[in-house]
Amino acid sequence: GIDIHPGARIGPGFFIDHGTGVVIGETAEIGERVRLYQAVTLGAKRFPTDDNGDPRKGLARHPIVEDDVVIYAGATLLGRITIGRGSTIGGNVWLTRSVPPGSQVTQANSLHELSNEALQVGT
């Protein structure tokens, strides 16, 4: 199945292809014409708590996916990161850092700590 929290904000033209296993968290923001494939997670890294250990509600903790992004099968994007407009996130990528517009992130380059040079447009 597909699990989309009702609080997620989703733009027009959003498309899920082969949606089994897709999870979209409560504070996720998805732009226009975004495509996701099976088993993609747009999740939180953690749920912050207050001084009493109670969960703090209303904090943005899920990814922002800008317009015209494609995220391939099995990718996991965690935390309040931004995936820049026109980027492509490859299959099985685990991502906890923002990427600028036009980025191409593959499993091979996500296995190493991504430097600013590795995240340049068109790489």
Regions inferred by a protein language model and the residue ranges of each:
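Structural signal for interior beta-strand "rungs" in well-ordered beta-sheet cores
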Residues: I2-E113, E117
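Long, amphipathic alpha-helical stalk/connector segments used for oligomerization, subunit docking
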Residues: T106, G122-T123
